[in-house]
From Swiss-Prot:
<feature type="transmembrane region" description="Helical">
    <location>
        <begin position="277"/>
        <end position="297"/>
    </location>
</feature>
<keyword id="KW-0067">ATP-binding</keyword>
<comment type="similarity">
    <text>Belongs to the ABC transporter superfamily.</text>
</comment>
<comment type="subunit">
    <text>Homodimer.</text>
</comment>
<dbReference type="InterPro" id="IPR003593">
    <property type="entry name" value="AAA+_ATPase"/>
</dbReference>
<dbReference type="GO" id="GO:0015421">
    <property type="term" value="F:ABC-type oligopeptide transporter activity"/>
</dbReference>
<dbReference type="InterPro" id="IPR039421">
    <property type="entry name" value="Type_1_exporter"/>
</dbReference>
<keyword id="KW-0997">Cell inner membrane</keyword>
<keyword id="KW-0812">Transmembrane</keyword>
<dbReference type="Pfam" id="PF00664">
    <property type="entry name" value="ABC_membrane"/>
</dbReference>
<feature type="transmembrane region" description="Helical">
    <location>
        <begin position="57"/>
        <end position="77"/>
    </location>
</feature>
<feature type="transmembrane region" description="Helical">
    <location>
        <begin position="135"/>
        <end position="155"/>
    </location>
</feature>
<dbReference type="GO" id="GO:0016887">
    <property type="term" value="F:ATP hydrolysis activity"/>
</dbReference>
<feature type="transmembrane region" description="Helical">
    <location>
        <begin position="21"/>
        <end position="41"/>
    </location>
</feature>
<keyword id="KW-0472">Membrane</keyword>
<keyword id="KW-0813">Transport</keyword>
<dbReference type="InterPro" id="IPR011527">
    <property type="entry name" value="ABC1_TM_dom"/>
</dbReference>
Amino acid sequence: MDIKLLYRLAKYLRCYKKDLIIVMISLLSVSASLLLIGSVFRNLVDKGLSKDHISSVDNSILYICLLIIILSIASFFRSYFINNVAEKAVNQIRKEAYSNLINYEIEEFEELKIGDIISRLTNDIDQISTLIVNFLSFFIRNSVMLIGSITLMFFESFKLASIVIITIPILLIPLIKFGKHVKVLSKKALESKSLLASDINETFNNIRAIYAFNHQINKIADFDTKLQNYLIYCKTRLKIRALFFAISIAVIFLAITLVVWIGASDIVKGHLSAGQIISFIYYAIIAGVSCGGIFELLSEMHLPVTALERIITIIDKTPIAHNNYLELNNSDPISIEFKNVDFTYHSRPNLRIINNMSLKINANKFLGIVGRSGAGKSTVIQLLLRFYRQENGTILINNQDITLLNPAEIRKLIAYVPQEASIFSGTIKSNIIFGNNEASDDEINEIIKITGIEEFAAKLHDGINAKIGERGVRLSGGQKQRIAIARALLRMPQILLLDEAMSALDTMSEQKLLESIKKIMRGNIIISIAHRISSIESADYILVIDKGGVVAEGSHNDLSKNSEIYRNICREQLTI
């Protein structure tokens, strides 16, 4: 077991010292009660039954009942407080892991699967709870009882105790042999389980596509393949565990049988009393059960320890911190400038997306961006939001290099509406005020009216307080986009970024909404990426992007005359 990992876990347990003291006292009480019962048995046999002293029998039974009561009460406190500590500790770990994850760089999520994240924050952390309970409760209890029972066995009979001690190294051999193999299998089992979680997440996020293409049978077969892979690791691990358990039981009970055989001979010879052998066998059984329990726990520790290791990697991967950010100059009219910017995604290192791009946009302007798929249009927005950092060149906001500014401060200036509207489970209203939870009811109602939400919300039973389901499953694509736009406008941004934000609306609705947006954003900047020319036809000027660079710019009329690429895009849409 990795001591460093356990030390890290101990850091989360330190703030629950009082609870842990109660757990330790309870553990010692449980162990002491069980061990004392052995000496009571010896007195019962030697002084009570053998000499026919009924009072000794009564006293022994009374002591046993008293010890059982202490055992029961102590067991209650042990179980309650250790599980309570485990729940509080894992909640703190879960919160810390979640807080770290949510502050990762965006590009790091390209390498992570959502299912793997979910699995780590749920299944892995549940395994850590098991680790806390098993180690602080059962492992320590069994260790105390093992040491105590062996010590008492030596007091009863040195010879018989030595026989029992010999069995421990015999049990250590298979534990060491199988341990490394089980650790590898545990890691693979957790990784395989994460793949299952990813598959489930992906399947039900795309359930409509699966139905539309009749892919249910294919998805079931694919899921079954992943399930069988997971099962193989689990079965192999369980076989090793079962084999070790069988070996442990055999060795322990053979040792007890040998003790009984030799002990019976010593009773006949008068070297031991009947009470001593009964007491010794009782301690031997406790030692055997405790030893078996310890080895069983050690063989099972690999899974939760691996889970802890996976969570610690999340917690230790702290976001890049900068303490020397410049103060954002927000007194001048808003402006944006790209100077010779290059960019390549880490996940696609051989494909340059932005190539020596330069552009400038000042306040009170509406900039449209067009280009073919993969030209780099959306990447412009991603860079402006500081989701990624450019390789070369400079991006300026208000003539300040954005790499020297706090990303959170930059994003306060911006409202972003992606093509696939980000809708959270909850109500229409809760999704809108996500953009500005300090907005007044009058401001919310005004935005709802402008974006056309009022019209469809009025048909719902609870209006804007209607539940819309996970990811807005009860809404149409156009309704989701209206909510996303309302959220952005409620933020009162200086820069509004629209990435195919009205693609689900008809042309008439789009134009009406666009006019409202332009009025609200007067004096600020609108950047709109569009495949549909009607979305940016009224822009002050339009950039045509191809192969990561600006190949033409101007008004719609200018580009219709002077840009072959722009004319082709317009012609293709007219053909459609």
